[in-house]
């Protein structure tokens, strides 16, 4: 995994960074894992022991297969290695099976597939402008970017403690972005098409890909003022892109189309019967909306303005994944969230079309699409913030304003999954790892932009420092108060709402910077 190196002054520092974080991942193998561990074990069993015609129908476990076909084939491939570790993990009826060999296999499968992420980071480093490079290795943008991505705290806790496979999926996305910077548009489009059929959450950033490829690849030239030169449109390029999407989709969905199972597959991929918010509210607009509704309902009950018998039984803080009704405010439907998400994305997509800024403009639009979907999407998971945090790392080493936005977004976004790791042994691990990553991120970017104005104003500094008292209250004070029994949801509510404020601020600040940036005003041949 550490084979991808960038030699600087005779030292293979990239390999050292990759090897170091790999060793840390190995040390995290015995830590707590969530129900996602059983989810993926069950998918191994389904794809290994059942014919393809039953993959999206099997429901022995509540953790049914709900990822696109490429991920199902990925699990199928892993299962043929898993059988040499413990054959019993591949039995569909062995629910909640977790032997020591199963643990080792699943943990190492995540570590091994992270090789793609390492390679993608290596390729992204090639796209970084080295003009700001300092004399010291640790002050070079490529070194800072490598550390921010390879040692990303969010990926470490979500993949290697909580348990998921975000590393190699993020690697596909970063590699696709790198190919655009390298003007290898067809390859970038192919990688993204493949990624969509691994995990459909990346549909959120598809508008950025579609508009950028149409504007900057299918149209081969601009006028002097940056507007489109309409006679430069290439039908050949458009057909080539369409062919890529068609062939990848046919390879993924073709077998299920032949089995007349596409409706069943899509019903698994888009389960709208789940509630607006996850069991733990993702820190987005709907968390603020739901928290306001919760406050109004508590006040209404205390003042006897609401009838307790008429309050919906499906509580948003019960930890259950189900549909629910808001108590005071109007309940939100999937259609409403879709419309809000679309409206939130439109300005960024409009800027990408009307104010082309090359791959960097595409990257900004991608991040805004990811954040807009996070802010207003249906049943958003708190872990989805990584979809914006990781690509934002690339912007952070380019401009001071982007570094400021990145630090606010990543610090807040990384703190928000803390409630996922609720066991005592993981408490010092998550606190120490986040502190180390946050301190490094702030200090390295401050050094990189030391000749410019401070990265934070007083309000931003005060907000970020507030995460410390919030953690102390939630972990060490609240459990010993009388409110713990009557209002057990308060720590989750406070964490979600506080982080939602920071993420909303970062989203708005990035939007402002995109809207005021001028277009690239010269003709460019792609």
UniProtKB/Swiss-Prot annotation:
- The UniProt entry lists the main location of this chain as endoplasmic reticulum
Q: Which domain of life is it from?
A: Eukaryota
Tell me the compartments it is located in.
Answer: Endoplasmic reticulum membrane
Q: What is its EC number?
A: 2.4.1.265
Q: How does it sit in the membrane?
A: Multi-pass membrane protein
Pathway info: Protein modification; protein glycosylation
GO BP? dolichol-linked oligosaccharide biosynthetic process; protein N-linked glycosylation; protein N-linked glycosylation via asparagine
InterPro entries, alphabetically? Answer: Glyco_trans_ALG6/ALG8
Per its record, what are the GO molecular function terms?
dolichyl pyrophosphate Glc1Man9GlcNAc2 alpha-1,3-glucosyltransferase activity
Indicate whether Transferase appears among the record's keywords. Answer: yes
Where, by residue number, does the polypeptide cross the bilayer?
4-24, 103-122, 143-163, 188-208, 238-258, 334-354, 368-388, 389-409, 427-449, 461-481, 488-508
Q: Provide the Gene Ontology terms for cellular component.
A: endoplasmic reticulum membrane
UniProt catalytic activity: an alpha-D-Glc-(1->3)-alpha-D-Man-(1->2)-alpha-D-Man-(1->2)-alpha-D-Man-(1->3)-[alpha-D-Man-(1->2)-alpha-D-Man-(1->3)-[alpha-D-Man-(1->2)-alpha-D-Man-(1->6)]-alpha-D-Man-(1->6)]-beta-D-Man-(1->4)-beta-D-GlcNAc-(1->4)-alpha-D-GlcNAc-diphospho-di-trans,poly-cis-dolichol + a di-trans,poly-cis-dolichyl beta-D-glucosyl phosphate = an alpha-D-Glc-(1->3)-alpha-D-Glc-(1->3)-alpha-D-Man-(1->2)-alpha-D-Man-(1->2)-alpha-D-Man-(1->3)-[alpha-D-Man-(1->2)-alpha-D-Man-(1->3)-[alpha-D-Man-(1->2)-alpha-D-Man-(1->6)]-alpha-D-Man-(1->6)]-beta-D-Man-(1->4)-beta-D-GlcNAc-(1->4)-alpha-D-GlcNAc-diphospho-di-trans,poly-cis-dolichol + a di-trans,poly-cis-dolichyl phosphate + H(+)
**Alphabetized UniProt keyword annotations:** Endoplasmic reticulum, Glycosyltransferase, Membrane, Transferase, Transmembrane, Transmembrane helix
- Function comment: Dolichyl pyrophosphate Glc1Man9GlcNAc2 alpha-1,3-glucosyltransferase that operates in the biosynthetic pathway of dolichol-linked oligosaccharides, the glycan precursors employed in protein asparagine (N)-glycosylation. The assembly of dolichol-linked oligosaccharides begins on the cytosolic side of the endoplasmic reticulum membrane and finishes in its lumen. The sequential addition of sugars to dolichol pyrophosphate produces dolichol-linked oligosaccharides containing fourteen sugars, including two GlcNAcs, nine mannoses and three glucoses.
Q: Which family does it belong to?
A: Belongs to the ALG6/ALG8 glucosyltransferase family.
| UniProt protein name | Dolichyl pyrophosphate Glc1Man9GlcNAc2 alpha-1,3-glucosyltransferase
Native organism: Bos taurus (Bovine)
């Amino acid at each position: 995994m550490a084979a991808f190196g960038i030699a600087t002054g005779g030292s293979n520092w990239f390999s050292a960074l990759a090897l170091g974080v790999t060793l840390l991942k190995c040390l995290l193998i015995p830590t707590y894992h969530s129900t996602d561990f059983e989810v993926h074990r069950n998918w191994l069993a389904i794809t290994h022991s059942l014919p393809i015609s039953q993959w999206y129908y099997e429901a022995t476990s509540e953790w049914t297969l709900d990822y696109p076909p490429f991920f199902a084939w990925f699990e199928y491939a892993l299962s043929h290695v898993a059988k040499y570790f413990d054959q019993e993990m591949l039995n569909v009826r062995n629910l909640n099976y977790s032997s020591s060999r199963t643990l080792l296999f699943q943990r190492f499968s995540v570590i091994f597939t992270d090789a793609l992420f390492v390679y993608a980071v290596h390729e992204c480093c090639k796209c970084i402008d080295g003009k700001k490079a300092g004399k010291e290795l640790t002050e070079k943008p490529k070194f800072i970017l490598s550390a921010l991505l390879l040692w990303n705290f969010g990926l470490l806790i979500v993949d290697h403690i909580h348990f998921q496979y975000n590393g190699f999926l993020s690697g596909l996305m970063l590699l696709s972005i790198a190919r655009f910077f390298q003007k290898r548009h067809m390859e970038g489009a192919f990688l993204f098409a493949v990624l969509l059929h691994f995990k459909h959450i990346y549909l959120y950033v598809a508008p950025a890909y579609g508009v950028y490829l149409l504007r900057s690849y299918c149209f081969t030239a601009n006028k002097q003022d940056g507007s489109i030169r309409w006679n430069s449109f290439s039908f050949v390029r458009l057909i080539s892109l369409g062919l890529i999407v068609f062939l990848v989709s046919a390879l993924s969905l073709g077998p299920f189309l032949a089995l007349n199972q596409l409706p069943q597959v899509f019903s698994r991929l888009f389960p709208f019967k789940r509630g607006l918010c996850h069991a733990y509210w993702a820190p987005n607009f709907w968390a603020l909306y739901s928290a306001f509704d919760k406050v109004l309902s508590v006040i209404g009950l205390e003042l006897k303005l609401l009838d307790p018998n008429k309050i919906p039984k499906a509580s948003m803080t019960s930890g259950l994944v189900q549909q629910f009704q808001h108590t005071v405010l109007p309940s939100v439907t999937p259609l409403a969230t879709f419309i809000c998400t679309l409206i939130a994305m439109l300005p960024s997509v409009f800027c990408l079309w009307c104010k082309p800024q090359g791959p960097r403009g595409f990257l900004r639009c991608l991040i805004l699409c990811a954040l807009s979907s996070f802010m207003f999407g249906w049943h958003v998971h708190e872990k989805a913030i990584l979809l914006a945090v990781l690509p934002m790392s690339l912007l952070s080493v380019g401009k001071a304003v982007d570094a400021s936005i990145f630090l606010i977004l990543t610090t807040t976004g990384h703190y928000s999954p803390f409630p996922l790791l609720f066991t005592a042994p993981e408490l010092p691990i998550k606190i120490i790892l986040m502190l180390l990553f946050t301190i490094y991120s702030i200090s390295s970017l401050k050094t990189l932009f030391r000749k410019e104005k401070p990265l934070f104003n007083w309000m931003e500094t005060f907000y970020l420092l507030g995460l410390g008292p919030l953690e102390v209250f939630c972990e060490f004070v609240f459990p010993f108060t009388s409110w713990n029994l009557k209002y057990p949801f308060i720590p989750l509510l406070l964490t979600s709402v506080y982080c939602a404020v920071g993420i909303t601020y970062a989203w708005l600040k990035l939007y402002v910077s995109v809207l005021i940036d001028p277009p690239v005003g010269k003709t460019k041949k792609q």
